[in-house]
């Protein structure tokens, strides 16, 4: 169902994402992407408790039999900001031998999941969530972020997953035995955490998509060449995916 429990008629995908109109996500998942392809994307990003034969159309709304972890969600969102390249979340970045040679370098382990331009368009829409949608209040003063809110019926679970050009963070709030949350503070937790880890970082804008797409309900064409420095920024700064869990 939609986050506000109402139907708003036809709308752009940007509006649907920013206002959490889940009927749009469900229709795209069922009719355009197809459940087989949609679940396939998740399997390619290390979601370990999802099985194709147990997934229904409810998967478009996060309705999985065994659920997902914050680590898996952080890895998936990091794939978007990394231009479609999935890297398995890990605590180990690099291991050097006594000669200083890298014998383990996790930054070089990646696999292609999404098209680069599609990821940049998705980031642009997730940016709207933070600036004027359900995620207003999540952005720290020292970073530019994009992300998405998530809730279950009766507010028994609350999520916020988001990222900057430097870090990706997934927040979950809930009880071991599900019951309604008295208050939801995922946005505040995300904002405070991201503020702390960006204290020594410069604000960096997200990379821009090329081509025609809908922005702020108007069709625009944007073509922006990326400099070598812009292209490599993400590869140098997002080798670690911080993940945090919060429970009341």
Which residues does each predicted region cover?
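Extracellular mucin-like PTS domains
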Residues: 221-246
